[in-house]
Amino acid sequence: MAEICRVCMDISGKLVNIFDARRRTRVSIAEMIAQCTGFEVKRGDLFSEMICPQCYEDVKSAYGIRQTCEESHQFYCRVRDEGIEDALCALLEEEDWEISEDEDARIDSASAADDDGKSDSKKVAFECRECHKKYQRKGTFLRHMRTHMDGQSFPCPYCKRNFRLRVTLKAHMKTHNAAKPYECSHCAKTFAQQSTLQSHERTHTGERPFKCSQCSKTFIKSSDLRRHIRTHGSERPFKCSKCTKTFTRKFHLDNHFRSHTGERPFKCSHCPKAFAMKQHLKQHSRLHLPDRPFRCSHCPKTFRLSSTLKEHKLVHNAERTFKCPHCASFYKQRKTLARHILEIHK
C-alpha cells in the first residue's frame, strides 16, 4: 500500500507522506484530507499514507476553498448579528494579532510594490472601497485599510453616530432610509434588522449572553466581549506620557489622558454639564428624556437607564449578594449597602 496514492490510488514514483511534519504547512496533509472529506485519517489505519503531487495540489486547493468559505461565513454572521462596522473592526483586530514582525516586513515590501504599480500584471484580489487601491494579499489589504481608520471620523448627518470608515457610514445611512419593520416590545423603537432589535432588547431584559472565560464578565454583544478579551493580553502598546499606565487600545489611552488634562469635550445639549467620556454623556442625556423605556418584568416600574433597571431587579432576587465589610449584614442592592455603611458605620 505504500506505493499507492491514498486519494486517486495511482502508482507514482514521487509520492509524499501525508503525515510528514517537515513540510511548510500549518496543518498536515492528513488533516487537510480529513477536514475536506469528513473521513478519519490516522497513522496505522491500514490505508496508504502516501499522496501523489497532483492530488496534493488538489487537496491544498480544496482546503483553501474550505477555509475561505468558513472565514466568509463567520464574517457575514457578524455583519448579520452586529452590523458591518463592528464586524469589519473585529476582522481588522484579529488580523492585527496574527501578523508577526516578519510578516510585517513582507507586507511593507508588498505594499511598496503595489503603490509603485509594479504588480499590475498579477491577479488583484482585494480592492479598497475607500480609495480604490488594489492589493493581491489579504494581509496587505487589511494593513492598508487601517490607514483609513487612524484619526478619522465620519459623522452621520441624521444622528450623532461617528464612523471610522466612509463605507461603514454609507451602510449606516441606509438604516435611516430603509423600512424598519422590527419593533421593540418594550419601548416601541423600530429597527431595520432583526439582529439589531435582538441586541437592543437585551438592554431591557438585562440579558448578557457573552461571557469572558477569564474573568466571568458578561456582555450584550459578542463584539464587546472580543474587545474586552484583549485587555487580558500581555501586549499593552499604548503608553501614557504623563504616568506609567499602559493600555491595549488607543481609545482607552485617550479617555485616561483626559484625567490628566481635565478636558471634558462631550457637552450636554440640554444642560451645562460636560463629560470626559462619550459614554458618560450618552448615559446622562437619557435623564433628559421624558420616556422611561426600561420596564421591569417583575413589577410595573420603569426606568430611563438600563443600569438602573438592572440594579432594581436585585430587589426581586431573594439572594443578598452585597456584604458589609464592617459587620455581618447582607443587602440585595449596592446602594442599600452604601446607605447602611453611612448610617451605621460612619
From Swiss-Prot:
Pfam families, per database record: zf-AD, zf-C2H2
GO molecular function (one): zinc ion binding
Sequence ranges assigned to domain ZAD in this UniProt record: 3-79
Binding site for Zn(2+): 5, 8, 52, 55
InterPro entries recorded: Znf_AD, Znf_C2H2_sf, Znf_C2H2_type
Keyword hit for Thylakoid: no
Gene knockout outcome: RNAi-mediated knockdown in dopamine neurons increases dopaminergic mRNA levels of srl and its downstream transcription factors ewg and TFAM, and also results in a significant increase in mean lifespan (64 days) compared to controls (60 days). However, it has no effect on mitochondrial abundance, neuronal survival or climbing performance. Double knockdown with park or Pink1 in the dopamine neurons, improves climbing performance defects and rescues decreased mRNA levels of srl, ewg and TFAM in the single park or Pink1 mutants.
PROSITE patterns: ZAD (PS51915), ZINC_FINGER_C2H2_1 (PS00028), ZINC_FINGER_C2H2_2 (PS50157)
Residue ranges covered by zinc fingers (C2H2-type): 126-148, 154-176, 182-204, 210-232, 238-260, 266-288, 294-316, 322-345
Keyword Ligase belongs to the record: no
Cellular component GO terms, alphabetical: nucleus
Mod. after translation: Phosphorylated by Pink1 leading to ubiquitination by park.
Keyword list, A-Z: Metal-binding, Phosphoprotein, Repeat, Transcription, Transcription regulation, Ubl conjugation, Zinc, Zinc-finger
Gene Ontology biological process terms in this record: negative regulation of DNA-templated transcription; negative regulation of mitochondrial fission; regulation of transcription by RNA polymerase II
Role of this protein: Transcription repressor that inhibits transcription of srl/PGC-1-alpha to negatively regulate mitochondrial biogenesis and thereby promotes neurodegeneration. In neurons, functions downstream of the Pink1-park pathway and is likely to act as part of the Pink1-park homeostatic mechanism that maintains mitochondrial quality and function through degradation (mitophagy) and synthesis (biogenesis).
Subunit structure: Interacts with park.
Protein name: Zinc finger protein Paris
Organism from which the protein derives: Drosophila melanogaster
